[in-house]
Swiss-Prot record:
Its cofactor is Mg(2+). One of its GO terms (biological process) is L-valine biosynthetic process. It comes from Frankia alni (strain DSM 45986 / CECT 9034 / ACN14a). Residues 183-328 form the KARI C-terminal knotted domain. HAMAP family: IlvC. Its EC number is 1.1.1.86. NADP(+) binds at Y25, G26, S27, Q28, S51, S53, G134. Binds 2 magnesium ions per subunit. The gene is ilvC. Substrate binds at S252. It is an enzyme of class 1 (oxidoreductase). Pfam families: KARI_C, KARI_N. The keyword Hydrolase does not apply. This is Ketol-acid reductoisomerase (NADP(+)).
Length: 330
């Protein structure tokens, strides 16, 4: 079973006298920086001189430096920019200032797991990854609660890396809810698999295939949209709140019978075998190499596939129907 740490297992005293730099001010960056500051941590934000986020961070009372300046000052450097930017930011702005005794932290393990960043041996390397978007991390913190986080230690040069990671997690509110111990490998591989096979790739492909099946059988696209895309949120919300069993309890008997008898005909053993292939590509580095090469090459195939997806008929139907839904923010 996973080990879970709470407020009593962590101490902000570990961060006393230590300077923290949060590199990036996007969804997670702003939440980490503001929560740490409100927890009494000495924090500064590292942003490029031309970043549009500099003014916002300054307006919110944070000290704003360049990534290099922030890294030079800090004892603990948390890198919270997009994965594809990490290598350059690390090489240009962090590595020259990453002296022995410092700590390098991440919100996702991708670049460490696949060896794209290799910190020196004398540096602690840890991860604190909230299991929720930044705006939720900030809002719940202000309410006196927290969002669960994953914590991991990749390199414990100081012998105190876990205590530092837990103190950081406490500073952003994570130990209020629970900090689950994991590894960089487990976090990275499961996160990528979830995105590709279930949450993003799997769900979007399933929705499109269902929509196409109904339209090709002669049903109106608008009704197909409601049945295959729009109502998905209703079901996911039930699962989110109480699991699959609670969702099944909440739907009609007809829907539940169709679920348990027809669902396995959609996600067949062949589908699960393909899921395993996707997982194997994540574990052996095939996906990482493919994605890094695609990004380094200007993302031609990625851009083409995204643009093709925008042309799917379900997008046009949705654009026509969503204005009818007053509860959706426009």
């Amino acid at each position: 079973m996973v080990e879970i740490y709470y407020d009593d297992d962590a101490s902000l005293d570990v961060l006393a006298g230590r300077k923290v730099a949060v590199i990036g001010y996007g969804s997670q960056g702003h939440a980490h920086a503001l929560n740490l500051r409100d927890s009494g941590v000495d924090v500064r934000v590292g942003l490029p001189a031309d970043s549009r986020s500099r003014a916002k961070a300054a307006e919110e009372g944070l000290r704003v430096l360049t990534p290099a300046e922030a890294s030079a000052e800090a004892d603990i450097i948390m890198l919270l920019t997009p994965d594809t930017t990490h290598r350059k930011i690390y090489a240009d702005s962090i590595a020259p200032h990453l002296s022995e005794g410092k700590a390098l932290a991440f919100g996702h393990g991708f670049n460490i797991r696949y060896g794209l960043i290799e910190p020196p041996a004398g540096v602690d390397v840890f991860m604190v990854a909230p299991k929720g978007p930044g705006h939720l991390v900030r809002r719940v913190f202000e309410e006196g609660k927290g969002v669960p986080v994953l914590v991991a230690v990749e390199n414990d040069a100081s012998g105190n890396a876990l205590a530092v990671a837990l103190a950081y997690a406490k500073g952003i509110g994570g130990t209020r809810a629970g900090a689950l111990r994991t590894t960089f490998t487990e976090e990275t591989e499961t996160d990528l698999f979830g995105e590709q096979a279930v949450l993003c790739g799997g769900a979007s492909a399933l929705v499109q295939a269902g929509f196409e099946t109904l339209v090709e059988a002669g049903y109106t696209p608008e009704v197909a949209y409601f049945e295959c895309l729009h109502e998905l949120k209703l079901i996911v919300d039930l699962m989110y709140e109480g699991g699959i069993s609670q969702m099944r309890y909440s739907i009609s008997d007809t829907a539940e019978y169709g679920d348990v008898t027809r669902g396995p005909r959609v996600v067949t053993p062949a589908v699960k075998a393909e899921m395993r292939k996707i997982l194997d590509e994540i574990r052996d580095g095939t996906f990482a190499r493919e994605w890094v090469a695609e990004d380094d090459n200007g993302r031609p195939n990625f851009t083409k596939l995204v643009e093709e997806g925008k042309q799917h008929p379900i997008e046009q139907v949705g654009a026509k129907l969503r204005p009818l839904m007053s509860w959706i923010a426009k």
